[in-house]
A protein has these predicted regions:
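Autoinhibitory N-terminal propeptides
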Residues: 5-8, 17-139, 148
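N-terminal domain-start motif of subtilase-like serine proteases
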Residues: 28-55, 97, 118-168, 205-222, ...
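C-terminal subdomain of the subtilisin-like protease fold in secreted/lumenal serine endopeptidases
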Residues: 47-51, 251, 291-294, 300-309, ...
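Subtilisin-like serine protease catalytic core
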Residues: 136-279, 296-299, 328-330, 341-345, ...
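Catalytic-core environment of secreted peptidases
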Residues: 184-212, 404-405, 439-440, 452, ...
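Hydrolase catalytic cores
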Residues: 228, 236, 240-248, 269-273, ...
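Substrate-binding/access-modulating region of protease and related hydrolase catalytic domains
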Residues: 272-351, 371, 379-396, 402-411, ...
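C-terminal tail/sorting-segment detector
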Residues: 772-790
Length: 790
């Protein structure tokens, strides 16, 4: 009877679907898109716009719930609970019942899943990981032993040699694969993979397989293998690598692998499949559960998320960001800042008085023709735009079509004058874009083929008023071939002191003024990924360490175009690296790490896929063994910078497994390098605290927590000093917990040649007057260590 009553309730309230205040606006617009097969969506795999053949029967959602019986009530109403963290549940529910489930008394907020996008030789040396691996003047070498390095990504090849132990067994402890599908009643497929040796000890379970039999989750994507390799790749055997002596031509040599990662002996855990935010949350939860339950005691864990989206409130209070924040209490989570700062994909309007107006154009990233498999578009504008007030107060937003031939006079106005409670206003050109409930406007059709929709609501997630616009337009080649008709936004304040933050999804459009008077250009500040705005996560930007590389085809390539200057100056912040000043006052990212460009392992199945068109020009190294070829190549992005930090944090966690997010982020900021590039180039917000320094961070960990590793081993009862050569005739000495440094240098015959005392735990020694040779260095009476002065 209860379920029957629920169905009757759904039928009675379906007509008010857009008035549900517990369902965020983006989810409401997503439901409109799912249920209306006339609306085309972009398929990134086929690189075309496609209309769904049928309505999706089930959807995944996050529910923020309340009450002791909430989970039972959700289950009783057809929402299958998959995961729970705090007061947030990941559920699968029928598409037809979303609004009704949102109205249950036990539901505080409900959010549907939304797409996110994937966003080391020089690197290791630059941030000091090589020193840590070698244990140079450290109590011991740190390689991530006993630490779980987790990753959620796509394009993972877990049997790449970079992830195998020297005996050929896998370093992966567990992989989960989550994909949406119409072939199961649940609407998704959840598969689990374990090492065969572990699987053989388990009872037979459905959808559980051996990691050794896993090929890849994607034959068209290398990303996850690349990021995993940066974070935790450990193969150090021989490879065939390209080398150059003149930055023009290259030659191939067999050398020990240069391109292994940070936590070379860590235990790797991954989640892959469809890249939607709630599938990602599912994967993060899987990794944390593994770190808690896979051994006799909990293992320290760091998780890399080289994923994100620029859409969203950029607020820590969204359901997804609250979930990540809760996960950040159980693992150190590193999130990519994003790669959208190349374009002005954000805009912040601050109004001194009421009835003030800011206007901007929605400009296509690809101007002119854009060919897909099925259709050619002209000045394609596609995607979503969110505009948020700084509080619950409304503002007025109009989507306009202007005519530059008539001094940008407005030809069509699509107004969102006040709160529509989620009810969309839709304008369409008709024809192929005939949408139920849309206004077919002849002037709009003269300008574009396509549609524009917009709706507004007081956001149940953040309490802020906002407008969401969704659109797909292509210039009409009969009546707008010259592109005079353009799409724009007009934002009008309703009170003094109002702030409106506008974010594009950074896929096909950005905000520009076309050099027109009275119009406003967008900003790079605000390009930060929404997921990076969660509390208890470390957001990572990118700086440049390489702008050219030798390839296996005999040539050297780079990103810099001949005669056009240096696009990626070594040492500077990468121009694409996203950043933002949020409405709550925070500046992100937290830190920058090497991300342009980084050479790492890549998915063999992607490289060998004929449709991908790989040649030796795209590859920097390869190795063949047992009939399988393995490859390495360069890539760039905050996706690459983030696992640099995650891998280094695994080394810190080996040194001190008790480190928390607050410890790690404080040490990152405290030990960041602020060199001349940080001080004098780029936007200060884009740099965060500066450049990440893994070695200085580890020294600080040792200083605060001592040199205890996971196994509780100390090389000496007494703390050992750290000696670091800073030149051929100079070095520093560091001793954790020391208040005064007393350094003595002796020849091998025992003659004292130098004595120096300083306050603190670190001292600089100038050996320029010493004879060449080997010296014994004693710090505070510790056992002597050898150094060589050249």
């Amino acid at each position: 009877m209860r379920k029957l009553g629920f169905i009757i309730l759904c039928l009675c309230t379906a007509w008010t679907a857009f008035g549900q205040s517990k369902l965020d606006l983006q989810s409401q617009m997503m439901l409109l898109q799912i249920r209306n097969t006339a609306i085309p969506t972009y398929n990134s795999r086929t690189r075309s716009f496609e209309r769904p053949r049928e309505v999706q029967q089930n959807v995944m959602a996050m529910v923020e719930f309340m009450g002791q019986n909430a989970l039972d009530e959700l289950d009783a109403q057809g929402a299958k609970v998959l995961r729970v963290r705090g007061d947030i549940a990941i559920v699968m529910m029928p598409t037809a019942d979303v609004e009704c489930i949102a109205e249950l008394k036990c539901v505080r907020r409900l959010e549907l899943s939304r797409p996110v996008y994937q966003k080391m030789d020089i690197v290791r040396k630059t941030i000091g990981i090589d020193k840590i691996h070698q244990g140079i003047d450290l109590p011991q070498a740190y390689t991530g032993k006993g630490v779980v390095t987790g990753i959620v990504d796509g394009g993972i090849d877990p049997n790449h040699i970079n992830f195998l132990k020297p005996d050929g067994t896998t370093r992966f402890g567990y992989i989960s694969k989550i994909t949406a599908t119409t072939t199961t009643q649940q609407g998704y497929l959840y598969q689990n993979y374990y090492p065969r040796a572990v699987l053989d000890t388990m009872k037979q379970q459905d959808n559980t397989y051996a990691i050794e039999d896993f090929a890849t989750d994607s034959y068209t994507n290398f990303h996850g293998t690349h990021t995993s390799g940066i974070m935790a790749g450990g193969y150090k055997g021989n490879i065939l690598a390209a080398k150059t002596d003149d930055q023009n031509l290259s030659y191939n040599v067999t050398v020990p692998n240069l391109y292994y990662g940070g936590a070379t002996e860590s235990e790797i855990v991954a989640s892959c499949g469809d890249l939607r935010d709630q599938f990602i949350a599912f994967g993060v939860d899987d990794i944390i559960n593994y770190s808690k339950l896979s051994g006799p005691k909990r293992k320290p864990c760091v998780i890399n998320l080289s994923l994100g989206s620029n859409l969203g409130a950029h607020d820590p209070n969204s359901v997804m960001n609250r979930f990540l924040s809760l996960c950040g209490e159980d693992a150190i989570i590193c999130v990519a800042a994003g790669n959208e700062a190349d374009n002005t994909v954000a805009l912040t309007a601050k109004f001194d008085k009421a009835d003030s107006t800011v206007q901007t154009f929605v400009r296509p990233m690809i101007e002119g023709e854009y060919k897909t498999a099925k259709k050619t578009y002209y000045n394609l504008r596609n995607g979503q735009i969110c505009a948020y007030s700084n509080d619950a107060d409304e503002f007025e937003l109009q989507i306009v079509v202007t005519n530059s031939a008539r001094k940008n006079k407005v030809a069509v106005r699509i107004p969102v004058a006040e709160n529509t409670n989620g009810q969309p206003v839709i304008y369409s050109s008709g024809g192929d874009y005939a949408i139920n409930g849309a206004v077919v406007n002849s002037t709009f059709a003269k300008a574009f083929e396509g549609y524009v929709s917009a709706a507004s609501i007081k956001d149940p997630e953040t309490g802020r008023y906002y407008v969401l616009a969704q659109f797909l337009t292509s210039d009409n080649q009969t009546t707008n071939k010259d592109g005079n008709y353009k799409l724009g936004l007009l934002i009008k304040s309703k009170k003094a002191g109002q702030r409106v933050d506008v974010y594009g999804d950074a896929q096909f459009v950005y905000f520009d003024d076309y050099a027109q008077e009275g119009w406003t250009k967008g900003s790079r500040n605000g390009s930060i990924s929404d997921m990076a705005c969660a509390n208890n996560v470390i957001s990572v930007g990118s700086y440049n360490v390489r702008n050219h590389w030798p390839s296996l085809d005999g040539y050297v390539y780079g990103y810099n175009k001949q005669g056009e200057g240096n696009d990626f100056p070594v040492g500077e912040a990468s121009r694409f690296s996203s950043f933002g000043t949020l409405a709550d006052g925070r500046n992100l990212p937290d830190i920058c790490a090497p991300g342009a460009s980084v050479i790492s392992s890549v998915n063999t199945f992607c490289v060998t896929n004929p449709d991908m068109g790989y040649t030796s020009a795209a590859l920097q190294a390869k190795f063949e063994k047992g009939g399988k070829a393995y490859y390495w190549h360069q890539s760039l992005g905050t996706s690459m910078a983030t696992p640099v930090v995650a891998g280094a944090i695994a080394l810190w966690l080996e040194a001190d497994p008790t480190l928390t997010y607050k410890d790690v982020v404080r040490i990152i900021r405290q030990t960041a390098v602020k060199d001349e590039y940080v001080k004098n180039t780029g936007d200060p917000v884009q740099w965060g605290a500066g450049k990440f320094d893994a070695y200085a961070g580890l020294k600080q960990v040792l200083l605060e927590k001592g040199a205890n590793g996971i196994q509780g081993v100390k090389t000496e009862q007494r703390e050992m000093p750290v000696l670091t050569m800073t030149g051929s005739r100079s070095f520093t000495a560091f001793l954790a917990k020391a208040k005064q440094m007393n350094v003595r240098a002796y020849t091998l015959s025992g003659q004292l040649v130098h004595s120096q005392v300083a306050q603190g735990n670190e001292i600089n020694i100038n050996a320029s007057s010493w004879e060449k040779g080997v010296y014994l260095i004693q710090v505070n009476g510790s056992p002597a260590q050898r150094i060589i002065i050249y």
